[in-house]
UniProtKB/Swiss-Prot annotation:
Organism, as annotated: Salmonella agona (strain SL483)
GO biological process, one term: DNA catabolic process
Pfam families in the record: Exonuc_VII_L, tRNA_anti_2
Annotated localization: Cytoplasm
Name under which the protein is recorded: Exodeoxyribonuclease 7 large subunit
TM spans (from-to): none
EC number per UniProt: 3.1.11.6
PANTHER family tied to this protein: EXODEOXYRIBONUCLEASE 7 LARGE SUBUNIT
Length: 449
């Protein structure tokens, strides 16, 4: 009979190993509540203690890399909530637990509720990014839902006054701690939406323990924030404090002061941007005016080159040259005719053809008359064309405009005055008239209506 059961016989080592594997694989991590006793901390930094209740106890160990994350010092007799792995110490066969985290019993229960509500609302989509409303930019009125006596309100108002003193602020005072706080926060959110006075809400309070911040882990508050038509910025506690309200809000600020920074404009920065824009505009105007001034100078020089008086002088010079050429040509023709006449006379004298001489003389006289008339006609035509050109040039000349009583005024640096803002009282300006120039001092500047 013994031989048939030898396959089921365990050594002590194998038994303890099998039990350890069963405990670790089947149980996994569990939450255990109990009272601490026999707490010790040797030089290694590990914690060793017993966790017990009224009828049982179990040995516990919490290694240094885990207990350094515990925010309090465990005390004998303290009720705690421990998240641990169940195992067995094989050399002695001692059953024990290895703690991974530890919380005071009250906070531990709240943490469980927090995780359950977080999972529930997440599954319903209340945290989805698609539901987040954009914040107004800039905000025209800020609503603040917090305690009227808390430090958070003071911090928010201080930042808003520093950054944007003209920004209107509406305070919806509520309790932020205690049994009545969630209901008051919900009513304040609903009131702000009903009134429609502001375009962004800051909902929050200062720092505290998990119990102090619990109002912002309330399901009613979370759903009120989600239903708000006004964008909500959550500002609960410090940067390390994360509440359900932070997940539901359109934007989470790490602190109340940071929330005020987010919803407000920095007027000093805005002023600097305006001043920078003014400087750039001034530089652009200076460049534009300098460019127009250069363009005006170029046009002015071109007009001077094409001034009617200059063109008239050139025409007169050309006409004088033509007259000289015509005179030279006439003299040459007369000289040639005279020479021909002399030759003919000589020939006639030699041949004495009197009738032919008379005819030749008559022909010469006719030619001289026709030549003279032709010259006179050409001169008359040239004078008429020259007169027409002068009349046309005078019609388009700026001097003609001056002759009608208009004037052109310029500053001391040669810029043409178009608007009164180009001069001020005491400036000297130069005015061009039809027959000359005059300088005058500006006594006063009066804008036109």
């Amino acid at each position: 009979m013994l031989s048939s059961q030898t396959s089921s016989i365990f050594t002590v080592s194998r038994l303890n190993q099998t039990v350890r594997l069963l405990l670790e694989q089947e149980m996994g991590q569990v939450w255990i509540s109990g009272e601490i006793s026999n707490f010790t901390q040797p030089a290694s930094g590990h914690w060793y203690f017993t966790l017990k209740d009224d009828t049982a106890q179990v040995r516990c160990a919490m290694f240094r890399n885990s207990n350094r994350r515990v925010t309090f010092r465990p005390q004998h007799g303290q009720q705690v909530l421990v998240r641990a792995n169940i195992t067995l110490y094989e050399p002695r066969g001692d059953y024990q637990i290895i703690a991974e985290s530890m919380q005071p019993a009250g906070e531990g229960l709240l943490q469980q509720k927090y995780e359950q509500l977080k999972a529930k609302l997440h599954s319903e989509g209340l945290f989805d990014q698609q539901h987040k409303q954009p914040l107004p930019s800039p905000a025209h009125c800020v609503g603040v839902i917090t305690s009227k006596t808390g430090a958070a309100l003071h911090d928010i108002l201080h930042v808003l006054k520093r950054r944007d003193p003209s920004l209107p602020v509406i305070i919806y005072p509520t309790a932020v701690q205690g049994d009545d706080a969630p209901g008051q926060i919900v009513r304040a959110i609903e009131l702000a939406n009903a009134r429609g006075e502001c375009d962004v809400l800051i909902v929050g309070r200062g720092g505290g323990s998990l119990e102090d911040l619990w109002s912002f882990n309330d399901e009613r508050v979370a759903r009120a924030i989600f239903a708000s038509r006004i964008p909500v910025v959550s500002a609960v506690g410090h940067e390390t404090d994360v509440t359900i309200a932070d997940f539901v809000a359109d934007l989470r600020a790490p602190t109340p002061s940071a929330a005020a920074e987010i919803v407000s404009r920095n007027q000093q920065e805005l002023l600097r941007r305006i001043q920078s824009a003014q400087q750039r505009l001034g530089m652009a105007m200076d460049y534009y005016l300098a460019n127009r001034s250069r363009r005006f100078t170029q046009i002015f020089h071109r007009l001077q080159q094409q001034h009617p008086q200059l063109r008239l002088a050139r025409q007169q010079t050309a006409l004088e040259r033509l007259r000289q050429r015509m005179g030279f040509a006439l003299e040459a023709r007369i000289k040639q005719a005279t020479q021909r006449q002399q030759r003919v006379s000589q020939r006639l004298s030699q041949q004495n053809p009197q009738p032919r001489i008379h005819r030749a003389q008559s022909r010469i006289q006719q030619l001289e008359y026709r030549l003279t008339e032709n010259i006179r006609s050409r001169l008359s035509e040239q004078r008429e064309r020259f007169g027409n050109a002068v009349t046309h040039l005078e019609a388009v000349s700026p001097l003609a405009t001056l002759a009608r009583g208009y004037t052109v005024s310029t500053t001391t640096n040669g810029k043409v005055l178009k608007k009164i803002k180009q001069v001020k009282a005491g400036d000297i300006m130069t005015t061009r008239l039809e027959d000359g120039w005059l300088e005058s001092e500006v006594k006063s500047v009066t804008p036109g209506t």
